[in-house]
Amino acid sequence: MTSKRAEVLAKNSEMSRDEWLIERRKGIGGSDASIILGLNKWKTPFELWLDKTGQVPVSESQSEAAYFGSLLEDIVAKEFEIRSGKKVRRKKAILRHPEYNFILANVDRMIVGEKAILECKTTSAYNLKEWEDEEIPESYIVQVQHYLGVLGPEYRKAYFAVLIGGNKFVWKEIERDDELIDMIFKAEIEFWNDKVLGGQAPALDGSSAAEEYLKKRYAETENNKAIDLTAANRERIQQYLLIKEQISELQSQAKELENQIKHEMKDAEYGFIGNYQACWKPVVSNRIDTKKLKDQFPDVYEKVKKETHFRRFGIKEVS
């Protein structure tokens, strides 16, 4: 374990939003740690690899939840001060580990007079159980332990301030866990050296990013080319067909239940039971009748039609 202090990579106040996004791509931050460990619900290691290797554009876009989370950060931090009696200050910089310059930290707040940090969160009321009693989501525990690891061994504690559903506030604290920090950094070092610098892609997953990657990389085909698949693909194909069959059966069961509920609703647009609401409302949809357009206005159809190319995947049993 190093006793050196974290270094300032860049000051947030001296960077534009675009520059800040580019700097984040140059290393592994706290929110990346849970992705690498497979604990993140929203992003996979493969998607992170695409981002860190520059294979997807640096994205400025953020979800509405993330937008309001950023907007409310000051309010959450001030409420923490009121409830805890502690004082906090901003650390307006991207920090980096003194030995591993690709391990970065962008800490929300530092605790004044204490070797500790504050992480501010906003979350939906649906996630209330994740914060009940002593509970803290694993991905956030990993995030702050990553930060404590970057800051150095003298930083012994992290606090969370959380606004839940816009009307419930909780704050919690956790101690530094050196064993967990070592495990996190080991995984991050391996990911950066082997995957990012070494160009070795993580295992493909079911994300839309992985699908787009394959579409772009293998957009062109060799006409009628056929290959012998490796032995491992026999089991993959069998599992694929089984899952597709299960999906079809489940969709049929779901449709049956849906029809039974609709039958009871009759001409009502809404139905209520307990804390559930069923909705069956009329929807107006305007679409172009392409067949009619082609028949009656062939010249216009030729001008506006768009030809697309894609590869269709399918599996069938052959003799």
UniProtKB/Swiss-Prot annotation:
It holds the Pfam family YqaJ. It comes from the Bacteria. SUPFAM superfamilies: Restriction endonuclease-like. Gene3D superfamilies: 3.90.320.10. PANTHER family: EXONUCLEASE, PHAGE-TYPE/RECB, C-TERMINAL DOMAIN-CONTAINING PROTEIN, EXONUCLEASE, PHAGE-TYPE_RECB, C-TERMINAL DOMAIN-CONTAINING PROTEIN-RELATED. This is Uncharacterized protein YqaJ. It comes from Bacillus subtilis (strain 168).
